[in-house]
Amino acid sequence: MNTATGVIALLVLATVIGCIEAEDTREDFQGGFESDDGEAAEKIFRRAPVCTRTDQPCPYDQDCCSGSCTLKKNENGNLVKRCD
């Protein structure tokens, strides 16, 4: 076996080992990690919700920090919803 074949074999082996270790946990839809073996909900780590600051566009699924969102003109003169 020459050097190139040995390097390729080591890369394949490292990839296989990495895939086997990566099977133990998978990222859930909010960025936390969930175990394959059915851990309880309190053991799943999730990111904390974040509110949108003043003068930022109002997103569809998040609340503004101030609690209100109104139509305002942007730099192009168009009306857009922004957090108060």
Curated annotation (Swiss-Prot):
Residues annotated as site: Critical for insecticidal activity: P57, N74, R82
GO molecular-function term, one example from the UniProt record: calcium channel inhibitor activity
An individual GO BP term: defense response
Domain of life from the UniProt record: Eukaryota
Keyword Ion transport: no
Annotated signal sequence range: 1-22
Keyword hit for Signal: yes
Family: Belongs to the neurotoxin 08 (Shiva) family. 01 (omega toxin) subfamily.
UniProt name for this protein: Omega-hexatoxin-Hmo1b
